[in-house]
Amino acid sequence: MDEILKTRVKDLCEKIRSGQIKSIEIVKACFKRIKETDPKVKAFLKLNEERSLKQAAQSDDKIKTGAECGSLEGVPIGIKDNIMIKGESMTSASKYLENYISPYDAAVIEKLKEAGVIFVGRTNMDEFAMGGSTETSVYQKTANPWNIDYIPGGSSGGSAAAVSSGMVPFALGSDTGGSIRQPAGFCGIVGYKPSYGLISRYGACALASSFDQIGVFSKTVKDASLLTSFIAVGDYRDPVCETGEQTNYAHGIYNPDILKTVRIGIPKQLSNYKADEEITKYFGDAVNKLKLEGAATVEIDVPAYKYVPALYEVIMCAEVSANIATFDGIRYGYRSSNGRNLNDEYAKSRAESLGYEVKKRILFGTYVLGAKNYYRCYHQAQRVRTLLINQITDAYKKCDFIFSPATLQMPVKFGEKLSEECDIFLTAANLAGLPGITVPCTFTSSGMPMGVHFMGSRFSDAKLFQIADAFERISGFDINKYPNL
């Protein structure tokens, strides 16, 4: 593997701007690595090699001539295939959108273009982001780079696998119930989901609108904070996006005293779930490392954690059924040629183009929103969601961050299932609209990486990056170790 690919993004930016490294060298190294590893991993659905090399040459010319450059000029990135880039296909890994061309840029893409980033390709995902393994993509299954017989997690598994294997220095994903942070844990990298409303979702294909957020994959916490600084900007086109000053999350991320001043909450409910033995052991080691550095740990009690899987299924599926209702095959997307009338055409367009997991969620969502079930299912779920939010808010009176394993299981082989409780502490962040970040902490005896998760209070993202960065420094995890593919 080319050593240039092990360079952290901040250092890449400085070396490109100073002329020590050319952007075209980095982009060529990325595509060389992709050609060597992606036939096994299958992280990318589409590559833009010719255009990327042309853009890299243009970036180098800008720097050489002293022209105005973006702050991330010439740095390559992977983009999950549910985020629009004007003039490019966006499939959401579904047959329904296989010929769809994005008519405009997503808000995050606009900001990255201003920063001078180079989009090397589209990463694989579960179809319409519905799944936790990247197996429901209609095009290919993505493998975990550390063992290609195992899943990388999902739904943003392609982005996670691409960063983990060194194909790109960072990537964008989306997170509805852990879809960035779970695969980050499985693949041994950093995965960050922002506070609800911090990053605009304009131009991202909606799954469940009260959960969805766009976030970041990277090898280090500092790289994640750097990218977030460019995309976390107020946007009136997303009605829940906060408007405010742009924040440099990378500035001041190094806080040598933070562990001596914070209280870390450990959920009492952890003991209620059967986590993999090694996860329990290594999580305990991580807690002890925090204590040794001066962090205070307190037990917090959030009884409503037990409702998280059911809450997520009911509310998420209800929102899925509403969002997918706009996919009629008439205005855009797959259109059946077998319809006898308009209603039949709607039905057949979906039946012929949507996968099993998507259909299952639409059906369940339609059921819980039905007149007979709305109050006892959907309405009750929203009430319990409020209960969960209130209990977590109360927990933050005793602590500054909630700390847990990223997942309660290690990755499974293709075709095997994760338990419904596996992502419970990740999904809670989506239900409550809170920021969360997964940081790798160790390798297990099987050679697979394991991650831990910090969850902060609403809009505590800057401090969340600080605590995650502090843990990264004491974890002992070798960020320069890459899978041998």
From Swiss-Prot:
Domain of life (superkingdom): Bacteria
Keyword set includes Ligase: yes
Top-rank EC class of the record's enzyme: ligase
The keyword Nucleotide-binding belongs to this UniProt entry's keyword annotation: yes
PROSITE patterns: AMIDASES (PS00571)
Parts of the chain that traverse the membrane: none
InterPro entries: Amidase, Amidase_CS, Amidase_dom, AS_sf, GatA
Any one GO biological process: translation
EC number: 6.3.5.7
GO CC list: glutamyl-tRNA(Gln) amidotransferase complex
Function: Allows the formation of correctly charged Gln-tRNA(Gln) through the transamidation of misacylated Glu-tRNA(Gln) in organisms which lack glutaminyl-tRNA synthetase. The reaction takes place in the presence of glutamine and ATP through an activated gamma-phospho-Glu-tRNA(Gln).
Assembly mode: Heterotrimer of A, B and C subunits.
Protein name as annotated: Glutamyl-tRNA(Gln) amidotransferase subunit A
Taxonomy of the source species: Bacteria, Pseudomonadati, Elusimicrobiota, Endomicrobiia, Endomicrobiales
